[in-house]
Amino acid sequence: MGKPGQQQERPGYTKEMTPEPKDSMKDYEGRGLLKDRRALVTGGDSGIGRAVAVAFAKEGADVAIAYLDEQEDAERTAELVEAERRQCVLLPGDLGDRDHCREVVDQTVKGLGGLDLLVNNIAYQNPVERPEDITDEQWEHTFNINMHSFHRVTRAALAHMGEGDAIVNCASVNGLRGNKSLIDYSATKGAIIAWTYSMAQALAPRGIRVNCVAPGPVWTPLIPSTMPEEKVEGFGEQVPMSRPAEPDELAPSFVFLAANRMSSYITGEVIAALGGETMPG
């Protein structure tokens, strides 16, 4: 089933959603796949990022999360990570600022003692009715958050990463097929996929794996905070499974791609978690 119609102000908050997303990995049991690894998750305050941060902690990793200003959501993520007896570093700020992209890496290394795993997950979207409605400011902001921050954070992180480390990027089904009302967003997600392929080739000689998860509809604060209420109603019903994914259902894909015991020969791949929808190619 889809979700009931609702809307809230940007950037969106978990507690204001009905129903709240399942993003605490309550039923997930770790197996030490990421024992003593140190991870940075952008957009880690809620949604997919929260579920990934908690799953990594359950697998034995310490985690830093970067987010804009959703402090209450971020503190809840920290509680969940620390409940697993792992460290959590909170890094608020605007990843659209190139200097802050470097700072979150520096603060992660300072707080955790190093950096082994990077999850580029932060995202911004603003639907439009017509292509002409996309202003230069919106176009540039969407690329700045969704694509430029990925590269800037990764560029800074590479100074601290080496053999056996991993990068996992979050794209979208819209990067595979496009979306008439999310033109700029879809363009960034397609760019992330191509960038993943290229970075995987470039970093393979260093022993750093780079992969991507491209989800279909997912129930996160991004949806009611950016989409009109009438489009939120029934969100996700179009896929064969007739519902959106919960963040908890996607986080294990990130664990798989981050864990050398599970995916040491996998790099330059995209996991498309689409609820039964198929893409050409």
Name each region found by the language model.
Residues 154, 188, 196:
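Active-site helix of classical SDR
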Residues 132-151, 168, 192, 241:
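Catalytic Tyr-X3-Lys loop
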Residues 1-2, 102, 110, 123-140, ...:
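Conserved mid-core segment of classical short-chain dehydrogenase/reductases
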Residues 172:
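Residue(s) in the substrate-gating loop at a strand-loop-helix junction
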Residues 71, 92-105, 136, 248-249:
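The beta1-alpha1 cofactor-binding region of Rossmann-like NAD(H)/NADP(H)-dependent oxidoreductases
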Residues 159, 201-205:
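Alpha-helical segment proximal to the catalytic Tyr-Lys
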Residues 4, 17, 25-26, 128, ...:
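Short C-terminal tail/terminal secondary-structure segment
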Residues 160, 208, 244-273, 278:
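C-terminal substrate-recognition "lid" of short-chain dehydrogenase/reductases
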